[in-house]
A protein has these predicted regions:
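Periplasmic c-type cytochrome electron-transfer domains
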Residues: 1-195
């Protein structure tokens, strides 16, 4: 079972529900965390982009995230595709031994729709990945959730996100749920410290 390998409280909750042992699942998540889960898959519609085992669809989206102070807006995927296509060592060049495996780059669009778009990140172990945003513009989950709740206009391109319009207590519940996605590393402690 893949969920037991990930070992987050959310995964244990899902495992318990899937085993039809409701008594076992009742204390795994708090009431607030369960309400946050309901918001995540319901009203907040987070699963549009954050789905699957990693809670990321690996697609590119412009969510209107502002650039870091003093920085120009980042062109995101649009710029990335252009840079890779111009690289003499990309997978489509004469040095590649398998450019047939490079169909994604061959057919990748670099149109204006990709301006300001970035790959959807996984929501696993969020506490370990702060600060948030493609350039670390947001210091806390609270800032991230407030951004999506308001969904401001993008500085460049278009913001695909729609305002969540959640109440403050719903944002708190959603954040509580997101924290259940953290899991301790499945590795011996000796490998986590300097020799």
């Amino acid at each position: 079972n893949r969920s037991s390998d990930l070992a987050s409280r959310f995964d244990e909750y899902v495992k318990s529900i899937n085993s039809n042992q409701k008594d076992d699942s009742s204390n795994i998540l708090t009431i607030q965390e369960k309400q946050g889960l309901k918001l995540f898959i319901g009203k907040a519609n987070c699963t549009n982009c954050h789905n699957g085992p990693l809670l990321a669809n690996n697609a590119f989206h412009n969510t209107g995230l502002l650039s870091s102070p003093g920085k120009l807006p980042d062109l995101g995927r649009k710029r990335g595709i252009d840079v890779v296509r111009q690289d003499p060592f990309n997978c489509l060049n004469a040095f590649s031994d398998n450019n047939k495996a490079c169909m994604e780059l061959l057919y990748a669009s670099s149109t204006k729709e990709l301006v300001g778009s970035f790959r959807t990140p996984s929501l696993r172990n969020l506490k370990l990945t702060a600060p948030y945003g493609h350039a670390g513009q947001q210091q806390s989950l609270t800032e991230v959730l407030n951004h999506y709740n308001e969904a401001p206009d993008a500085m460049i391109g278009h913001n695909e996100a729609k305002p969540l319009e959640l109440w403050s207590w719903e944002l708190w519940q959603l954040e509580a749920f997101l924290e259940t996605l953290d899991a301790p590393p499945k590795i011996e402690g000796k490998w986590l410290s300097a020799p």
